[in-house]
Amino acid sequence: MHYEWDERKNRENIRKHGVAFQDAQEVFDDPFHLSLLDERFDYLEERWITIGLTKGKQIIVVGHLYYLKENGDEIIRMITARKGTEKERKHYENIG
């Protein structure tokens, strides 16, 4: 699995949410992470929300896309990442 993002969006995300995409990708290594299809809006693409724990033990919520490259590599394209709320932290603890 590979990760990608727009660097300008990453800088904006750090400024707005205090979370770098480089750190947020760690949630996908969490064996208890949870990914759900984001059906809140009528996006023109299939968007996902993943919640998980980073190596620094921080609950992070990531908005992202999944897609396959022509060579078959699976790509996760980061859209946004933020620290989880208290409610999201409790939800995560109940699934882990």
Model-predicted regions and their roles:
Residues M1-G96:
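Ribonuclease/tRNase effector modules and their secretory precursors
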